[in-house]
Amino acid sequence: MQEYNFTPESIPILHKYNAKELLKGKEEISLDLGISKEKVESTKEAFFIRGIKVEKRIVEKIAKEKQNNIFFVFPEGVKKALFFDKAVYKLRLVASDTAPTLEINGIHMHRIKGITPLEDAKSKIKAINIKPGDKVLDICTGLGYSAIHAWKASESEVITVEKDKNVLELAELNPWSRELERKEIKIYLADAEEFIKELKDESFTAIIHDPPREALARELYSRTFYSELYRVLAKEGRLLHYVGEPKKRAMNFLLATAKRLEEVGFKTEILKHIKCVLAKKV
């Protein structure tokens, strides 16, 4: 198993909200989605963002955006935080001062209705009750919010696995994912189904399983995979399994997931408010 070398890049970000601030003459704005503020120089025709010239007409166009798009300011030009590689990957703005969500083919990878991605991650950490000293396994890293908050709560090493390199490369451009570079967070670029077979028995006290919807990753909802989760979890360890809300059959899907977990030995509790199943190894 080879650890992924997570290398964050500090790229200035524009979106419709801070673009409007620039056009109104505000000199200090946030270029990292609310983490900090910095000064932007300007002339009648352009803005100078960390020394990069951005023509006023481009900022005006961004300010008129109807969608919640994010734009990176590279020396070679302003580019939307979106790329194609068999699928469409996109960072989507949730608010001007908080972490964005990840979209793959238009599907949100976080709950964003009435909640921010950070609040979503924190609610999962609270639900599984991660404490100092817990050894945490985070399955499906995504933008890393769960792994980051698991590390903060456990004050210990966190192991996280992500199958899609495109997702990790997008995370490297996301200012709210920067703490993934901490040495205590070990990232592995691997298929979770195969990766988990390499892990030792009872080596974790808490597991966060946050897979894509079942139609996209059926193997991560299988009894075979759940058996592996049971094997690597210590006795009395906790598993939090996010299952989302597959259209109108959310409760039935939660019940079916809980049943499969029970069939491999877990004791379960349905947490409908966060669309998760909480399981315990007994």
Walk through the language-model features, giving the residues of each.
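A short glycine-rich, Lys/Arg-flanked "PGG" loop and its adjoining helix->strand segment in the class I
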Residues: 221-235
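Conserved class I S-adenosyl-L-methionine
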Residues: 131-142
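N-terminal auxiliary segments of SAM/dcSAM-dependent transferases
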Residues: 1-95
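Conserved beta-strand signature within the Rossmann-like core of class I S-adenosyl-L-methionine
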Residues: 236-243
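Conserved SAM/SAH-binding loop
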Residues: 117, 142-143
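S-adenosyl-L-methionine
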Residues: 161-201
